[in-house]
Amino acid sequence: FPYQGSSIILESGNVNDYEVVYPRKVTALPKGAVQQKYEDAMQYEFKVNGEPVVLHLEKNKGLFSKDYSEIHYSPDGRRITTHPLVEDHCYYRGHIRNDADSTASISACNGLKGHFKLRGETYLIEPMKISNSEAHAVYKYENVEKEDEAHKMCGVTQNWESYEPIKKASQLIVSTEFQKYMEIVIVVDHSMYTKHKGDSDKIKAWVYEMINTISESYRYLYIDIIVSALEMWSEKDLINVETSAENTLKSFGEWRAKDLIHRISHDNAQLLTATDFDGPTIGLAYVASMCDPKRSVGVVQDHSSVNHLVAITLAHEIAHNLGVHHDKSSCSCGSGYTCIMSPVINSEVIKYFSDCSYIQCREYISKENPPCILNKPLRTDTVSTPVSGNELLEAGKDYD
């Protein structure tokens, strides 16, 4: 990169080696087309390592449910529910033109922010805080100074040594009947609300970026992830959030069954917290529990300033709910890649579920037939690309 040795503080942390780029929009709208604030498809051109690339983006139209709501609380404890218009949102997925293996998950709300894969390397992009400038920083994730080199793990401890897959992934026939739809509620607890200084717009952007990232991973499991609601415990926690991930998970599941499930239509709920769970644990979820009122839940620690790392922890925990276990060494998601269901989170950028996860998810769905994910919900846009999903287990600083 041109600025080797330079250091800059960006949202992901201190970056030692970055490139300044000026993305140029190259999309031409068809004649007579109505100009949306955020088009359905966009292309941007910029240089990476001196070479021009074209980033092709398509809006993630299935991101929000038709009756999407946001909930927060007034100082006197009243619940305030709004139904914001989210049709014209700014969350995209895509690829680099002429690179068959490339992927991208980008928010275009204020400049381009997110990550893309180019020639096997993962890059992050974000706007630079320079007034009246289109300057963006592009950098490899490996050049972000890591906050904490300690291993982080999922708290789920079930093993599947006795598990012998009946079929290889290549033998599973995939048809449209395999497509499933998971409506999810994200609950942000008071510690996370406070960590982000009570800035609800910032919190929403942080959460939406995560869901946009994991929806891409779940496409390969033929599961659509759709956000039904975002609830922020803006005044105080509605459960006792403890440093014990196990106790917090139990309390959250009980609260969902007695409260949340009666006021918001959804299939699964995940709690995001800034509470530092005991030991290396950064997440926890029940295994094979999708659609159960108390157990279709997970808890995830907001453990990194890199959005992608927290997103993958969220994806991991949801997959446990879908009957997916931690990967063994024989599981693979491509040469040299760490997979989402690795029990330990290291400092690599992870994007894919393994062949084992795919088989376990499909077999769980075919055997258990969890009813809540069979219906195709109304969305802000009925056109949607298949998204795959696995169940996730607890996520922790280490995945046990």
Curated annotation (Swiss-Prot):
Zn(2+) binds at H316, H320, H326. It is an enzyme of class 3 (hydrolase). It is found in: Secreted. Residues 180-377 form the Peptidase M12B domain. The keyword Zinc applies. One of its GO terms (cellular component) is plasma membrane. The keyword Calcium applies. Residues 7-176, 378-400 form a propeptide. Residues 1-6 form the signal peptide. Ca(2+) 2 binds at V387, N390, L392, E394, D400. Ca(2+) 1 binds at E183, D267, C372, N375. One of its GO terms (biological process) is proteolysis. It comes from the Eukaryota. Disulfide bonds join C291-C372, C331-C356, C333-C339. One of its GO terms (molecular function) is toxin activity. Its main location: secreted. Binds 1 zinc ion per subunit. Keywords: Calcium, Disulfide bond, Hemostasis impairing toxin, Hydrolase, Metal-binding, Metalloprotease, Protease, Secreted, Signal, Toxin, Zinc, Zymogen. Its cofactor is Zn(2+). The active site is at E317. Its EC number is 3.4.24.-. Monomer. Snake venom metalloproteinase that impairs hemostasis in the envenomed animal. Belongs to the venom metalloproteinase (M12B) family. P-I subfamily. This is Snake venom metalloproteinase H3.
